[in-house]
Design a protein with these regions (language model features):
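Serine-dependent carboxylesterase/thioesterase catalytic core
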Residues: 38-47, 54, 60-69, 76-169, ...
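Short, surface-exposed alpha-helical segments at coil->helix boundaries
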Residues: 53-57, 184-185
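Flexible, membrane-associating and regulatory peripheral segments of lipid-active enzymes
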Residues: 1-43, 53-55, 62-67, 95
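C-terminal catalytic-base region of ester-bond hydrolases, centering on the histidine
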Residues: 167-225
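Short, solvent-exposed loop/turn segments at secondary-structure junctions
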Residues: 48-50, 133-134, 178-180, 204
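Alpha/beta hydrolase fold serine-hydrolase catalytic domain that processes acyl esters and thioesters
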Residues: 1-22, 136, 140, 147-150, ...
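Short histidine/acidic/glycine/proline-rich micro-motifs that form metal-
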Residues: 72-75, 205
Length: 225
């Protein structure tokens, strides 16, 4: 499987700006979506930046107890330990009645799935945004070389079979066929389990966390819990 075409890769950043501009247009409508009337915590895990602030604030507007992952920049396994990441869940579990939903952008979605696999009893659901957990992901991403440079030691998380196995909780994979960073096929969850859903949106990879359609689907899926 090949990485996205170079035209998609080179245009992903500019298209992310367009995603953010469209979000401003649709923001008034998104803010009118029903607010939750239940205790429900959400942790948002980043890709490789700290651009999840607007999404977190939007989820708080809808009544969710939402936070980032509180581990700094996500540069791969060196950015955190499993203990530090799971311990960051504790205050959210207390605020959310014992469970939390996880939303992960790109690499953050892979770690969200991993957390759900380790502690499924504490996870409502997992929503991934352009996360390359599918088979062949290492060869199908323009970010692979940078990731390997930052994380030279082999990591068990890189195993195709273990990554592609869905966690034992409801899982939604949001993807875009115009993804300029990873081959969109690696962001799909295979299988026909009723707890697994793949949702296509139009947009860039970088801008998935600032995409109006993505915000709509996140709000919809969280409300279903």
């Amino acid at each position: 499987m090949q990485p996205p075409h170079m035209l998609l890769a080179l245009s992903d950043g500019p298209r992310a700006l367009a995603d953010a501009a469209c979000l401003q247009v649709f923001s008034p409508l998104l803010r009118k979506l029903p607010k939750t009337d239940r205790k429900h915590s959400v942790m948002v895990l980043p890709g490789d930046d700290r651009g999840n602030g607007p999404l977190i604030r939007y989820l708080r507007h809808l009544g969710y107890t939402a936070t980032g992952w509180r581990q700094g920049r996500n540069l791969g396994p060196q950015s955190f330990t499993e203990e530090s990441l799971t311990s960051a869940l504790e205050p959210l579990l207390d605020a959310g009645g014992g469970k939390v939903s996880l939303v992960g952008h790109s690499l953050g979605g892979i770690y969200a799935r991993e957390i759900a696999g380790m502690r499924p009893e504490h996870i409502h659901q997992v929503i991934t945004l352009g996360s390359p957990f599918g088979k062949g992901h290492q060869q199908a991403s323009h970010a692979s070389r940078l990731y390997q440079r930052l994380n030279p030691q082999p990591d068990a998380r890189d195993d195709d079979d273990s990554l592609n196995t869905p966690p034992p909780v409801p899982t939604t994979a949001i993807y875009t066929k115009a993804d300029g960073v990873v081959n969109w096929r690696t962001s799909l969850q295979q299988g026909d389990d009723h707890d697994v859903h793949n949702i296509e949106v139009v947009g860039s990879h970088i801008g998935l966390n600032l995409n109006a359609a993505v915000w709509f689907w996140i709000a919809k899926k969280l409300a279903e819990v």
